[in-house]
Amino acid sequence: MNLNSNIAEFCTTNFKYMIALSVNINKIATIRNARGGNTPDVIVAAQNIERFGADGITVHPRPDERHIRYADVPALKKVVKTEFNVEGYPTSDFMELVIQSKPNQVTLVPDAPDAITSNAGWDVETHFDFLSGIVKELKSHGMRVSIFMEANPALMAKAAATGTDRVELYTESYAVGYSFDKEKAVAPFIETAKAAHSAGLGVNAGHDLNMANLKYFAQQVPHLDEVSIGHALISDALYFGLENTVQMYKNELM
């Protein structure tokens, strides 16, 4: 075994793969919009969250702009120094927004316009042609693309065939099942992550991940690149402070 092989083996054995924490700031925008004006300022909040150790900022602008407004996206793009991830259903307005703003990553979500929160993943078999066209368009503008998917290893090869770079695994079923049988709850995500990796896809995850269930998920699911967390993290920040909370969530990923 040569020196390079020894170094590679040492690194593999002794250093854990780092999972990125992207903080969804929609809830901060919800508070702002409840009173009008610009308090709290989502731009300042995003800058502070990065300074406190987050690896990225996520937003999900919806057509009714009930939290993040379309105008927030280019403003955030100017100041976010880590990774900027914009989620949403690819309407013509959404596509125009992200093509002009050019975030690092666009996550395609099959939301109805009136959805309170994301509640399902894409059926890539039914929407294959549609997704393939959208992915091609976004990638032609230099953006990484992720598709929001439920945990189903059988669909990962089909997802990869759209040309997407990553999938984001919809983790609500894990969060619901964690308290009853965490091994059973995480099992589909382990197999789906393996299948995604085998298909050449990066793996993100999000929805209802929190301080109670995050560490186990991160320990069990292989090839995990990024988690996106908003509601739980911002809620915890009311008790622990934003800086402490970001660092607490980061520690759960170590």
Show where each model-derived region lies.
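Hydrophobic faces of well-ordered beta-strands that scaffold small-molecule active sites
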Residues: 19-25, 57-59, 84-86, 106-108, ...
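Glycine-enriched alpha-helix->loop->beta-strand junction motifs that scaffold or abut catalytic
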Residues: 53-55, 79-81, 100-106, 140, ...
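Alpha-helix-loop-beta-strand connector modules within alpha/beta enzyme cores
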Residues: 66-92, 126-146, 182-205, 249-253
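C-terminal helical cap(s) of enzyme catalytic domains, especially alpha/beta-barrels
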Residues: 77, 120, 181-182, 236-254
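Catalytic cores of alpha/beta
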Residues: 92-101, 152-162, 209-224
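Glycine-rich phosphate-binding active-site loops on the catalytic face of alpha/beta enzymes
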Residues: 108-115, 166-178, 223-242
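Histidine/lysine/aspartate-rich catalytic loop segments that bind and position anionic ligands
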Residues: 144-196
